[in-house]
């Protein structure tokens, strides 16, 4: 199908995403989106702890299974190892068909390419990809579509329910045992955690690390 700038969009892409082709800069002016309702978990017993010892235990407690969507942020840029650590454990557990919904992926995440090749990761939704991940996508190694959005477009997709995040991993520099997070006060201060705000609000489960006293 031909879009508003004359580009032919494959029908299989339209069918897979349920999207319309680009109809012009102002085609959605005054359009109303309905927000999805996030899942909220209650904690009434002050003696019950949400703490776990490691990534494996966190994944088990979050109910990891085939076909889930896992989200990450990129505030640590090329110093981020959260994606690699989590995906290594998911791979070791034998989980397949994972979609990664990240605010961005860079060269620091090159180690996850083998998981694309073996089917651990089958979909990527991000605001950008670089390095060997980009090469893997460009050469057809990713089974499903790679969907790129602006940072604001990613927020809209999550808030509207177009993307449902099952588990969000947020590598905040500091957090407490209640899950309150901030971007300073630790060993990897990174500034405002704005990219991960929508993940924290809408994901079914949220995992954080770098504990400090409440």
Regions found by a protein language model. Give the residues of each.
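Conserved alpha/beta enzyme-core scaffold
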Residues: 1-214
């Amino acid at each position: 199908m031909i879009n508003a700038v004359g580009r032919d969009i494959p029908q299989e892409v339209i069918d897979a995403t349920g999207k319309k082709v680009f109809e012009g800069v102002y085609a959605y002016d005054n359009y109303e989106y309905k927000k999805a309702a996030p899942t909220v978990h209650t904690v009434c017993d002050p003696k019950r702890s949400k703490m776990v010892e490691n990534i494996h235990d966190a994944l088990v407690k979050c109910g990891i299974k085939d076909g889930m969507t896992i989200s990450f942020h990129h505030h640590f840029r090329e110093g981020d190892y959260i994606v690699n650590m989590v995906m290594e454990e998911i791979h070791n557990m034998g989980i397949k068909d994972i979609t990664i919904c990240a605010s961005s992926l860079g060269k620091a995440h090159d180690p996850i390419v083998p998981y694309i090749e073996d089917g651990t990761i089958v979909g990527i939704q991000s605001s950008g990809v670089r390095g060997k991940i980009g090469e893997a996508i460009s050469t057809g190694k990713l089974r499903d579509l790679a969907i790129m959005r602006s940072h604001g477009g990613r927020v809209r997709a999550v808030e509207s329910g177009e993307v449902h995040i099952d588990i969000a991993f947020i590598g905040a520099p500091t957090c407490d045992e209640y899950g309150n997070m901030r971007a300073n006060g630790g060993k990897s201060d990174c500034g405002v955690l704005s990219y991960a705000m929508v993940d924290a609000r809408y994901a079914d489960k949220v995992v954080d690390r770098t504990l400090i006293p409440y």
